[in-house]
Amino acid sequence: MSNSQPPRSSSSSQERAEELRRLLNRAAHAYYVLDAPDMEDPVYDQLYRELQDLEHQDSTLVSADSPTQRVGGRLADGFRSVSHRISLFSLDNAFNRDELHGWYSRLLKALDRTPAAGSPPPTLPMVGELKIDGNALALSYENGVLVRAATRGDGEQGEEITANVRTISSIPLRLHLEPVPAWVEVRGEAFIPDATFHAINNERLSRDESLFANPRNACAGTLRQLDPSVVAARRLDFFAYTLHLPDEWQERRPLTQWDALQWLGDAGFKVNPNAGLLPDLQAVEQFFDTWDTERRQLDYATDGVVVKLNDLRLQDAAGFTQKAPRWAIALKYPAEEAPSKILRISYQVGRTGVITPVAEFEPVGLAGTSVSRASLHNADRLVELDLHDGDTIVVRKAGEIIPEVVRVLPELRPALAQPLEITKTCPACGSTLVRESNESATRCINSSCPAILRGALRHWVSKGAMDIDGLGSKLIEQLVDRGLVQSIADLYRLDMALLGSLERMGSKSAENLIQALNASRSQGWAKQLYGLGIHHVGDVNAKAITTAFPNADSLNQAACHAPESITAIFGVGKEIAQSLQQWFSSPANQRLLDELRSLGFSLSLNEEEQSRATTAAANHHLTGSTFVLTGTLPTLTRSQAKEQIEACGGKVSGSVSKKTSYLVAGEEAGSKLTKAQELGVSILDEEALQNMLRGST
């Protein structure tokens, strides 16, 4: 039996909808963030259904902060890339007290507070926060309403996942503030609590689905689901830890990191309750030691402690390096260790012929994953460990990421166990291995070695080199093992008939691969040089080298007859020049270059590279100039502006200092603008920057 309600007027419906949103959002905050429910479930459900009915009757009542919008419709086309209003920097790490004190000394130097010889260092109050092992999110609010959520990405750009983030109940859809700033940027960590993670894996086990390795992987995979209802079902959580406000809120903004955390809590965010206000380095060490012991009692993973300078004005003064803030450091917990038994030594052959011994041992669980292999790096490490057949070893994850063998337990060694020695022959081709007197690496020097060829091909097709889609490791293995490809050049002789003879290669896939191979012929000279896999020549050095030597002939001439002209390039040393000399002196490599030319490769700068080189030459006056970018530019993203400045010889820094030549300021420029004005740094808008890039004054 139902009770009919008289129809509401549009104004009363709007008022009721606003009231329901307020009540429901307050109840959700009390339940999910404060862990102090103030509304019975049946009451919440009744009010929720009433709001749903109102919004269904009048779609204009639906708002972005409505609790009914936490789970949206399926995303049709994946995720789009978005630029962050404010960059997300990574943190430098410290793994012991010496590294912590080293960071503190650098911080004092950046703040011009280095003590005189023999004097104790000044104390600076810090805030200690647990480093949550999850996934960083950038949340954007406008007029108090969540309008965008994005992954960290590369720090400049991330993937927009707003629909998924709306499902996280500990993230407010509307800020609990009055009045609200025009915009707010919040940073924090999404994560899956341990109990939730185990429940998810139990559900997957019951459906015979593969299990997630650890909560962090589960969280990352969940955030990239195309269906927000799947995200909602996995019950992600979130801790907020960083806040950015517009300049017009200068008088209202927090002055310390501690106050910023309180601000975030007042605004409706869940803030980790275990943060601490720390007066000095000794308190930092005590905070770290406490949580290194007590972290196992928590219901979520934490892999360290983050220490931040408390005074936000001093944070601005300390600034940033190219990749990290000077005013913060991540103190990582000692790596988790576990014993295991050695089974065998296997070997990997790199693309330059380097032989890497790999310890294979009985599987052990470390930091949430199962580990059964660890690199031993080279023969010296094998000797240093004194590994014997059947030894019990201690394994850990360095930085809780990379497995490594720490030591051997000789007291558990079996009787008559034999020492394990590095192989004398290549495991891939059987050739005798060599070792130069000045190197720790043991190498295969057989140019026909299939393992070296496979590595060279993988490098050539990689994203940083020729970026050839559809040519993965499995396919490369087939091509090499069947003798269809014996050099990089052979890739460009593949046709539909040859590809069609391979396993799992349909006509459409073969057609796409041939198109990708043909398209790669037009890649720039820098990518081609990098793709050749010359020892010590990375992608950055390749750009510098090809700008100085615009084609293979000029580089060949310099490498073989004038190596000093190569070392004259900024950032290129003797080691690289020697590698280039050795590579270009090889008849086999000269044949490869001839083959590539015959297959349509120019082995010279393409139009885009020539344009950049011309621009750099025309604007050589930017060499020696340091730029800082702040705010939003009208047409250029920060990445584009940085790339163009660097192409003209300039350097881009993350913070303003006495050494800054120019500050490029866009809309909503922050404290960097104020500091630049105080220091008398020249201020440019985008138009002035563009004129400078063109060489105009």
Curated annotation (Swiss-Prot):
Biological process annotations from GO: DNA repair; DNA replication
EC number: 6.5.1.2
Domain BRCT: residue ranges: 617-697
Keywords from the UniProt entry: DNA damage, DNA repair, DNA replication, Ligase, Magnesium, Manganese, Metal-binding, NAD, Zinc
Cofactor(s) it depends on: Mg(2+); Mn(2+)
Source taxon at top rank: Bacteria
Protein residues bound to Zn(2+): 426, 429, 444, 449
Record-stated family: Belongs to the NAD-dependent DNA ligase family. LigA subfamily.
Protein name, UniProt field: DNA ligase
Species this chain originates from: Synechococcus sp. (strain CC9311)
